[in-house]
């Protein structure tokens, strides 16, 4: 070890043996230093770090744990095998840390037969299938206005406290995917515990693999948790399963990347994010989608927007990468309607092809009414609009209570795709094949 600055370690003698992304083992030489390092790490496992830069000064490492007990006389060696993992379907029902160690008090998860690289390349574009059939998300507002097909990747964009985590809980409970892989990146420990025990519940956890990296973990582990989440999802997809991959949040993954690349010496650009952050985002997210076989990974990724500003650099990059965006609005949340979906600002790139022929006119009609009401909301609130001035606005005012009731949904309520469109058709006065006996 030559130098320790902040969280960055610089060592010599390995420049010809390691490359970027390799994992190294860091071994304190003295007994006292080893004991101190083990106490800081919380276990007696070897201390690991990843190579993030190489230059004439030596090999630059960022550690997977705290640096307590590490001195300049520490010995650094190449550690092989940490860039691959062997997931198994027997991981379903388990909560794991970024190194695939159990967090639920159970035994170590059994390894699968096939080995997967954590940083695998996405499938070649010419080998990918198109979107699969529509996925019933179990959330009425999303089924109606932002349809999601198997293999699609969508973002949930919102500021803090607008209901992203609650919406993820609903998706985890109510969607009809075969299996779920949930990545909690940079979350508070209390929220992780609440999601595992109250949010998912026993039924949701029984079909989920949960990967957790809390906010107090080093940036390298927060980054690794996101890659482990996608790797587990790929392994389940290769078993022919329709996997729903939920990551909360991509913004905190990007913040971890910012820490890593700034420590490695990259210059900051847009809002302090180095260029490599924007290069790495698609490398992670492109791994979701339809596979080359029967399985698929449908991805729903939350994006925390600063000050509810969708032009934030990470939010802007995510909209360009993903196949749709679900926007949650603070004003709607403050009015008490959850999920706080902003229908007019949300978009699914699988629409309108995802809709059946009888569904499309109903949804288009509803969107026209919602837009008409939004454009004249101020006049209506001031009492300046006179009924009869515009038939479309009159219809929008009359339909608003029914539309708001349809968009609202309790966390424990599960909607059914066919019934959702039938209810919307009845609310708007459309004839609908499956609307028999359905009332609002």
List the predicted regions and their residue ranges.
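P-loop NTPase nucleotide-binding/switch module
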Residues: 74-76, 83, 90, 103-152, ...
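Active-site phosphate-binding and catalytic loops of NTP-dependent enzymes
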Residues: 33-35, 83-87, 102-108, 126-132, ...
């Amino acid at each position: 070890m030559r130098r320790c600055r902040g969280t960055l370690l610089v060592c010599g003698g390995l420049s010809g043996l390691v490359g970027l992304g390799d994992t190294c083992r860091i071994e304190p030489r003295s007994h006292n230093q080893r004991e101190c390092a083990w106490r800081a790490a919380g276990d007696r496992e070897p201390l690991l770090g990843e190579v993030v830069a190489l230059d004439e000064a030596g090999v630059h490492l960022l550690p997977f744990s705290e640096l307590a007990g590490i001195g300049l006389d520490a010995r650094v060696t190449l550690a092989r095998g940490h860039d691959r993992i062997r997931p198994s379907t027997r991981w379903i029902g388990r909560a794991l840390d970024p190194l695939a160690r159990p967090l639920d008090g159970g035994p170590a998860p059994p390894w699968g037969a096939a080995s997967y690289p954590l940083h695998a390349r996405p499938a070649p574009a010419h080998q990918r299938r198109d979107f699969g059939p529509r996925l019933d998300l179990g959330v009425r507002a999303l089924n109606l206005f932002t349809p999601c097909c198997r293999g699609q990747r969508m973002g949930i964009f919102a500021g803090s406290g607008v209901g992203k985590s609650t919406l993820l809980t609903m998706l985890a409970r109510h969607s009809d995917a075969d299996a779920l892989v949930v990545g909690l990146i940079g979350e508070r420990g209390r929220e992780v515990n609440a999601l595992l025990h109250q949010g998912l519940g026993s039924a949701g956890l029984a079909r989920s693999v949960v990967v957790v990296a809390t906010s107090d973990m080093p940036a390298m582990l927060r980054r690794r948790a996101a890659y482990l989440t996608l790797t587990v999802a790929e392994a389940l997809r290769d078993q022919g399963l329709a996997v729903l991959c939920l990551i909360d949040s991509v913004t905190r993954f990007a913040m971890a990347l910012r820490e890593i690349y700034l420590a490695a010496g990259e210059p900051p650009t847009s809002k302090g994010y180095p260029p490599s952050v924007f290069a790495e985002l698609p490398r992670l997210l492109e791994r979701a989608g339809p596979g080359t076989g029967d399985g698929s990974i449908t991805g729903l990724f939350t994006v925390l927007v600063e000050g509810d500003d969708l032009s934030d650099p990470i939010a802007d990059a995510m909209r360009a990468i993903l196949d749709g965006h679900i926007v949650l609005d603070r004003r709607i949340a403050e009015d008490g309607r959850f999920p706080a979906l902003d229908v007019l600002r949300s978009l699914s790139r699988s629409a309108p092809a995802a809709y059946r022929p009888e569904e499309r006119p109903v949804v288009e009609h509803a969107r026209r009414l919602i837009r008409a009401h939004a454009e004249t909301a101020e006049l209506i609130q001031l009492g300046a609009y006179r009924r009869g001035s515009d038939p479309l606005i009159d219809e929008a005012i009359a339909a608003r209570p029914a539309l708001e009731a349809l968009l609202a949904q309790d966390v424990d309520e599960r909607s059914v795709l066919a019934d959702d469109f039938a209810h919307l058709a009845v609310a708007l006065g459309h004839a609908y094949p499956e609307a028999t006996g359905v009332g609002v």
